[in-house]
Amino acid sequence: AAEMADSMGIDIFNTSLGYTRFSNDTGGVDELTSWTWDDLDGNTSYITRGADMAAQKGILVVNSAGNSGSNSWKYIGMPADGDSVLAIGATDSSRWRSGFSSFGRGSDARVKPNVMAQGSYVYVSGLDSNGNSMVGFNFGTSFSSPLTAGAAACLWQANPDLTAWELKSIIEESSTQFNYPDTIHGYGIPDFGKAYELATQ
């Protein structure tokens, strides 16, 4: 998909992919095919390498951090571990980290998740059990990621001369914890007003 996106001239690629642990036939964890803590190095998995390659070609790759924060795995998945991937964690409407939002690895220089966006109590449209249109709430970093990708697209429209890497850096620099990132919130919540100023100065 990333190769096709590149061939079509896509500038921003948003995904909710997150590969971590796989089940065996009995419902347990298949240790042979599952990823380990050591594999979260940003270089091991093919999906992460592919996402980083897309970023190297000038695509802003935005990926949900994952919803494993409250289970036994608890860390981001692949390709969110890529150093060129903008991994997005989830907050609630009060700007508190959502309990399900996955944690970063924290054992090297990569800040993961990179930033946070609302992923709890997100208004979404859909169908009810009778097939009628409805609006309701939903949860997940799969909602945080496209919110960030959409805002990034607006920034890029404001200054089309930015590179994907510059845009990623501006989003991080505008965030609430830029000077003290951690493995829970990354650089924090972006201030897209501030990001706009940085993008257009």
Segments (PLM) and residue ranges:
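Solvent-exposed, polar/charged alpha-helical surfaces in well-ordered, non-transmembrane soluble domains
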Residues: E3, S7, R49-Q56, L86, ...
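Substrate-binding/access-modulating region of protease and related hydrolase catalytic domains
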Residues: A1-D81, S107-R110, S129-S145, T183-I184
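N-terminal domain-start motif of subtilase-like serine proteases
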Residues: Y46, D52-M53, R95-S101, P190-G193
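Extracellular S/T/G-rich loop segment that most often corresponds to the catalytic His/Ser-adjacent loop
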Residues: A80-Q157, D161
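Active-site-proximal flexible loops/turns
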Residues: S23-D25, W73, Y121, A149, ...
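Solvent-exposed loop/turn segments at secondary-structure junctions
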Residues: G18-S23, N67-N71, T91-R95, G106-S107, ...
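C-terminal subdomain of the subtilisin-like protease fold in secreted/lumenal serine endopeptidases
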Residues: I10-N14, Q157-Q201
